[in-house]
Curated annotation (Swiss-Prot):
The keyword Nucleus does not apply. Its cofactor is Mg(2+). Pfam families: IPPT. Catalyzes the transfer of a dimethylallyl group onto the adenine at position 37 in tRNAs that read codons beginning with uridine, leading to the formation of N6-(dimethylallyl)adenosine (i(6)A). Keywords: ATP-binding, Magnesium, Nucleotide-binding, Transferase, tRNA processing. Belongs to the IPP transferase family. It catalyses: adenosine(37) in tRNA + dimethylallyl diphosphate = N(6)-dimethylallyladenosine(37) in tRNA + diphosphate. This is tRNA dimethylallyltransferase. It comes from Helicobacter acinonychis (strain Sheeba). GO terms for molecular function: ATP binding; tRNA dimethylallyltransferase activity. Signal peptide: none annotated. The record marks 63 as: Interaction with substrate tRNA.
């Protein structure tokens, strides 16, 4: 979320003071109506690596799916402008059953994707609409390019009650700092189907602005959805990454400092 301009409260974007003390990358790169994706994440990471040279780089945040995609390798994607992307998004949105449609145009690709994996189904359909080629055929012609740099993976393990309390406090802080006003200004300015409007904290605020939630219900919805997301992220990290170091905040901090002193580029 921090990649988007003007979403500061909802993304808990680092303050100017924090950015002054520690160099941050990939902040404020996209307008609200532009699309974020794994290839862009990879490009921004590579740009940061070029600039940082011998400095230690930390990739932080909840984008574990993007990170996994980069480590396993990405195929080059069709080059599309924003208007083309929005047109494809709308075409996919008209499908009654996206998975059934994918199965009809590319049974081989559909076989590799679970029917509930909406993200991968969506990406496959994007390729089809952009190239008019079955995704499996497209990937044969555009094989994955693996990430060629050493990387060490860390994940925080926080006791459930402590984590839930932090989520509740963070939600309260966002609301106190003007979350609703921030989203209201953006929602009146940009297309309603913009990608950031689907994010937790943002989508609930929109429901509040549309008078579908009370203020109390808004806060409860953000807390509940964030807790569910944290659980999914934890499961994903533990099941999808090998050699993952899991520990408390202090343990992870100590491990990162130890590895940074050894000169490993992370």
């Amino acid at each position: 979320m921090s990649i988007y301009k003007d979403i500061n409260i909802a993304s808990a974007k680092p303050s100017l003071k924090e950015r002054k003390n520690i160099k941050h990358y990939a902040l404020d790169c996209l307008n609200i109506d532009e699309k974020n994706n794994a290839p862009l994440f990879k490009t921004l990471l590579e740009d940061a690596m070029k600039v940082s040279q011998k400095e230690i780089l930390l990739i932080v945040g909840g984008s574990s799916f993007y990170l996994k995609s980069i480590l396993e390798g990405l195929s080059s994607m069709p080059k599309l402008n924003n208007d083309q992307i929005l047109k494809i998004e709308r075409e996919i949105a008209t499908l009654t059953n996206p998975y059934a449609f994918l199965k009809s145009i590319d049974p081989n690709m559909a076989f590799k994707i679970h029917s509930n994996d909406t993200y991968r189904i969506h990406k496959a359909l994007e390729i089809f609409y952009a190239t008019h080629t079955p995704p499996s055929e497209y990937f044969k012609k555009n094989p994955k390019k693996p990430f060629e740099h050493a990387i060490t993976l860390f994940a925080l393990c926080i006791e459930k009650t402590v984590l839930h309390n932090r989520i509740k406090q963070r939600t309260k802080n966002m609301l106190d700092c003007g979350l609703i006003e921030e989203i209201k200004a953006l929602y009146t300015q940009y297309p309603k189907d913009s990608q950031p409007f689907k994010a937790i904290g943002v989508k609930e605020s929109i429901l509040y602005l549309e008078k579908q939630l009370t203020l109390k219900e808004l806060e409860e919805a953000i807390v509940s959805n964030t807790i569910k997301l944290a659980k999914r992220q934890n499961t994903f990290n533990k099941t999808q990454f090998n050699n993952l170091y899991v520990g408390s905040v202090e343990e992870v901090r100590h491990a990162i400092l130890k590895r940074s002193k050894s000169g490993i580029k992370e």
